[in-house]
Amino acid sequence: MNIVGCLDLPTSGTYILDGRPVSELKEKELTRVRRDTIGFVFQNFQLMPRESALDNVCLPLIYAGVSKKDRRQMGMEALERVGLSDRADFKPTQLSGGQKQRVAIARAMVNHPKLLLADEPTGALDSKSGKQVLELFESLNESGVTVVVITHDRKVAEQAKRIVHIIDGEITEEGQEAGNEKEKEN
């Protein structure tokens, strides 16, 4: 996830993002790529504890230079998509684990990234909320967003169009073998 998200650079091989080798990008360019192109959903949420859910969602928009009025509107729309617009003013300590995860997901998608990286996005969610998140990811993917989900949950992985198994940093299997259930039906 760190290499795909441009947090770390590869020590071997070449990672090409938007037609450019990432290792050739200067730090300022990498920052711009992370800010404008990639949305991150971290396993441990990474929410700012003293800020409201809405303020946490709007954080990437501050760095992108979006006006306060537009930030609020975009943040509320993102919270609405994850079913938490009624919790916009709540601090993280007032939210359940599943609600915190959905705030983190809203923050990851608020800047309309081309690439969404999600580390165990359903791990803290009940089955209903987890299903809603996966449906949201599917909707984002259908609209052109590349969604990469890192998971140990086979049922979550089976919803993917493509599955890559990685063990100790090495790709061991790749393809649709565990496959998309919709593909299996056809």
Regions found by a protein language model. Name each.
Residues 1-167:
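ABC family nucleotide-binding domain
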Residues 170-186:
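Conserved beta-strand-loop-alpha-helix hinge in the C-terminal portion
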